[in-house]
Amino acid sequence: MKNLIFILLITITSCNMENKDVLITIKTPYGDMKAILFEETPLHKKNFIDLTKQGQFNSTIFHRVMKDFMIQGGDVNLKGDPNAIDYTIPSEFNDKFFHSKGALAAARQPDNVNPKKESSGCQFYIVDGQVFSRDELTIDIQALYQGVQLLFQEEEYKDLRNEFIQVQNNRDETKKLALQYKDIVDEKYGIKTSMDIVPEKLDAYSNVGGSPHLDGEYTVFGRIVEGIDIIDKIAAVKTGQGNKPIEDVPMTISLEMVKKNFISKNYGYQYPNK
């Protein structure tokens, strides 16, 4: 009978754990941020949880801060710990997750020394980014400019060069003028000036903002779900050489177990079916 009760208790505990997930809290002098970690990136998720449980992130700093781009931290090796973290994590790219504002992603070494785009074992960044117009997200402006330069050579567009010269010091006006000739460039030279982008990305980058050029280059493994304004505050601090804040911005990271349906209901993350 005792064995049966023991087995039932283990089963109940196991079921309860399966119905729960971690909710991350990142404490900073500017306020707290809460984050969720995606199950679709299991290697990065496990690594982040393990380091958090070990207290590795505590007393680390945001060592690289770039306004309208991202805030980077988590380099536990800067603490001078003799047990340096020098391993990498295989990339876990997923089209569902992209670099909209608040995305939690893994930093990494550049392609020339890291062609597989493997992630740092500890460093991460949180996207600040900027809001883009729909034209910026759906039109290859460089391809369009190349097409316009071809038009300069056409007799019927001989006055076009002068029009561009008049607005050359105004980036927005230059772009606006070029857009008027998009259809002509497409048809006349067969240049593809349109870019494909899924509706979810288009809506996110044109409303909340982000850093779309990072998509497919770095693994996004989580998202800030509370304290988005803290990203702006940290991104706005004064920085010195190497984009390092003049005054340290330390952090401590902790986790708590909450029900998965709480995360889905409050933060909109839908867990994958197993």
Predicted segment positions?
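Sec-dependent N-terminal signal peptides
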Residues: N3-T13
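Cyclophilin-like peptidyl-prolyl cis-trans isomerases
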Residues: C15-K274
